[in-house]
Design a protein with these regions (language model features):
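Conserved ATP-binding/catalytic motifs of P-loop helicase motor domains
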Residues: 1-748
Length: 748
């Protein structure tokens, strides 16, 4: 059965015509879910039992995946084309890619004997054990009130799920998620009624209709908007409210003395940033420095001046306690290198209730990689700073990767007028060839021109390209100074496997278990629909009532959607019952255990913080130096060496030959090898700029399509702000306020 989305528009003369397909592609996913929701609701009322298919589509319960695939030759053709052409599947492909695959694999239809065809199908169905599926007892229609209750709950979940990572969300995606969550019970009409309720109450704020039809409208939550307002209010109210540490002359003299003693040379921009830290009278100020501009070098004399400025000028107001906070451990290391010994991750500082109580008016909090800090975390930090009368310096690059969580707070504060010094002169590539220096500069605002400065190999087949990336890595003289950056985990794994095979490391080491985490939001992890038999759950904290310990893994044995419980089979054989809606979603992960081998000489990368080894943190790289006995000995690039016990508990370690670009922010290497697939959703202006500027000297780039690559690196992938939605509210036009029947009519 298919749902058909017709491109028919009636003009003012009463004639019908086809319009541009852009808006149809934009709403294709929503239209498909409207169809699925209506179909599921009616099938459920007729008594048919349903279950989600491979791609989330409704399937009749009792029909196996093998039986479905037997009669899905066309779908298999498209799946095979997507895999061979772009290395993707129907779930990860865009509507445009699926359309292209459908067109390029389509054959002209031939006239057929329908009676004979049906007879053949029945015979084949019997051969594979496919019996007719009969409906069970008819289900009475849910009352309108009950359907609205379900729709309210589903929409609430959709809002929590989407606003966890984006402050403003495409309206169609929000509705689609709500329909998916309530599938079989509600339809689009129910969701529209609830949308009217939440917009009328102000819980959800909706952007003006885009009459040009170029994109979907955005919506945001009142909570996200209020959070942004509080952040902006903190910054604005803190202007001209603190005593400068030094006057301009004292700052110049102190910086000169420290530079001379330490043998440092700051350029004009770095010096201006350091001077601002010492002379500002604002509680909050920022330093926006491009990748590799020497932000750590700039911080060193400024931090020394804050802490010990009185040693250089008796008249200064120095003697400050400086705390360093970063969203990643790489940022924490950079802060310590800058002289801030008291540095830790922002998340651990916020989780420590005692940490904020010892702040005073003579405390400076330096938040590094501020562009990776979510609005929620920044607001929490600002509350502590505000209460203590302390001050904060936000350091980052608003053009690099943004926080996975919602809210580009650092960029928002700059737009609102926060005092900010910009550091733009790149230092990381100062000894690189001219074409590399030029490519790095151009990648900031003209990425398509940066491509012209690079030597790029075009290899269309994904597996062949991954093999070429591996071969390039093997040519490197110093593995410690080589980064292979990919956009997907599939590419990362393939490169790692290829390198290990070439180095003859396979089958020569010890196997251990690691946990591959799925991509679930906290809201999803609290939802029973996210669980299915075969998944595995890793617990990040102990739950006494359930009887599970930190680090334990349980396999999902069964899911009871009626009472909302998940039954787990633990490693020791005991059964544990978990009720996801009663958990926070923060302290457990849904994923799968996998076995990984480490051999003598393997390069590794730490992927979490569960090892609890002094000085070893997420993102650190090293080499396996011994695999004898029950331990794997690792020598880290930092010089530390530890033996790690191999057991049943998953270890957060992976092969370290290739990694995704997002995990490499803050790193630098002599040689950077880039995988740039033009069709990848992870390739955009931000990722290209961030990944390219990891290099100190050389860049080796690979793509599937050189012609399309220029368009891919120009794609904008910016986080949205709730304020952007509020600004457009004045001329809002809501479709559900018009009398119309949106629910599709299906004859069953």
């Amino acid at each position: 059965m298919h749902g058909v989305f017709l491109n028919i528009t009636r003009n003012s003369d009463g004639d019908y015509q086809a319009m541009t397909n852009d808006r149809m592609f934009e709403y294709q996913r929503l239209a498909q879910e409207v169809y699925h929701a209506g179909l599921s609701a009616r099938l459920a009322r007729l008594g048919y039992a349903l279950e989600p298919g491979m791609y989330g589509e409704p399937q009749l319960k009792g029909i196996t995946r093998e039986q479905i695939e037997y009669f899905s030759g066309r779908a298999a053709q498209i799946e095979d084309f997507l895999q061979k052409k772009w290395g993707i599947n129907r779930k990860t492909a865009t509507p445009e890619q699926k359309q292209a695959a459908w067109e390029m694999t389509r054959k002209a239809k031939k006239a057929r004997d329908l009676d004979g065809l049906q007879a053949r199908w029945r015979e084949e169905a019997r051969e594979i054990g496919l019996n007719e599926v009969f409906p069970g007892k008819k289900v009475n229609d849910l009352s309108p009130e009950k359907r609205l209750d379900i729709a309210r709950d589903s929409l609430k979940f959709a809002i929590e799920h989407h606003t966890e990572r984006e402050s403003a969300v495409k309206e169609g995606e929000l509705i689609r998620t709500a329909l998916q969550d309530g599938r079989g019970k509600i339809t689009i009409g129910d969701i529209y009624k609830v949308m009217k309720e939440v917009t009328s109450s102000g819980e959800l704020i909706r952007q003006v209709d885009d009459l040009a039809g170029s994109r979907q409208n955005l919506v945001t939550s009142r909570e996200a908007l209020e959070r942004e307002k509080r952040i902006l209010s903190f910054e604005k109210s803190g202007r001209n409210k603190v005593e400068p540490v030094m006057n301009p002359l004292q700052a110049e003299n102190t910086l000169n003395a420290i530079q001379e003693r330490e043998g440092l040379t700051l350029n004009a921009e770095q010096r201006a940033a350091a001077r601002m830290i010492l002379t500002t009278d604002n509680r909050y100020s920022g330093i926006n420095g491009y990748a590799g501009t020497g932000k750590t070098t700039m911080l060193k004399p400024a931090i020394e001046s804050l802490q010990n400025g009185a040693a250089f000028s008796a008249l200064t107001n120095a003697g400050y306690r400086v705390i360093g906070l970063g969203p990643q451990h790489s940022a924490v290391h950079a802060l310590k290198d800058a002289g801030i010994i008291e540095s830790r991750t922002l998340q651990s500082w916020l989780a420590d209730r005692r940490a904020g109580k010892d702040l005073t008016g003579k405390t400076v909090v330096v938040i590094d990689e501020a562009g990776l800090t979510s609005a929620r975390d920044l607001e929490s930090a600002m509350k502590r700073i505000e209460k203590a009368g302390a001050r904060a310096i936000l350091v980052g690059d608003s053009k690099q990767y943004e926080s996975v969580a919602a809210g580009p707070a650092f960029a928002m504060l700059q737009k609102a007028g926060m005092e900010t010094v910009y550091v733009t002169e790149m230092q990381r590539q100062r000894n690189a060839p001219e074409h590399i220096r030029e490519a790095a500069r151009l990648s900031i605002d003209s990425p398509e021109k940066a491509l012209e400065k690079l030597s790029i190999r075009e290899i269309r087949d994904p597996q062949e390209r991954f093999k070429a990336l591996s071969e390039e890595y093997l040519k490197s003289q110093d593995p410690k100074e080589t980064l292979v950056l990919t956009g997907t985990h599939e590419a990362r794994k393939s490169v790692n496997e290829n390198v290990r095979e070439a180095l003859n490391l396979k089958g020569k080491g010890r196997e251990f278990i690691r946990f591959e985490t799925g991509d679930f939001t906290e809201a999803q992890k609290k939802r029973i629909n996210s669980y299915e038999p075969g998944q595995e759950i890793l617990f990040g904290k102990a739950y006494r009532l359930m009887g599970v310990k930190v680090g334990e893994v349980g396999k999902v044995a069964s899911v009871d959607k009626e009472d909302g419980t998940v039954r787990l089979k633990m490693e020791d054989g005991r059964n544990v019952t978990m009720t996801p809606r009663k958990l926070s979603g923060k302290d457990h992960e849904i994923g799968q255990r996998e076995t990984i081998e480490l051999s003598l000489g393997d390069r590794i990368r730490i992927t979490g913080n569960s090892l609890r080894l002094d000085g070893v943190t997420n993102g650190m790289r090293g080499e396996v130096v011994d695999v004898s006995g029950s331990r794997i000995m690792i020598r880290f690039d930092s010089g530390l060496e530890y033996g790690i016990l191999v057991g049943k508990t998953p270890l957060e370690i992976d092969h370290g030959y290739a990694q995704t670009g997002h995990s490499a922010q803050g790193l630098g290497a002599q040689t950077v090898i880039l995988d740039l697939p033009s069709n990848s959703q992870t390739l955009n202006r931000r990722s290209f700029y961030t990944n390219l500027t990891r290099t100190k000297n050389q860049v080796k780039a690979f793509t599937d399509d050189r012609e399309k690559l220029a368009g891919a690196v120009k794609r904008e992938k910016d986080k949205t702000m709730a304020h952007d939605v509020e600004k457009a509210q004045a001329v809002e036009r809501k479709p559900w306020e018009k009398a119309r029947k949106i629910e599709p009519e299906l004859e069953i």
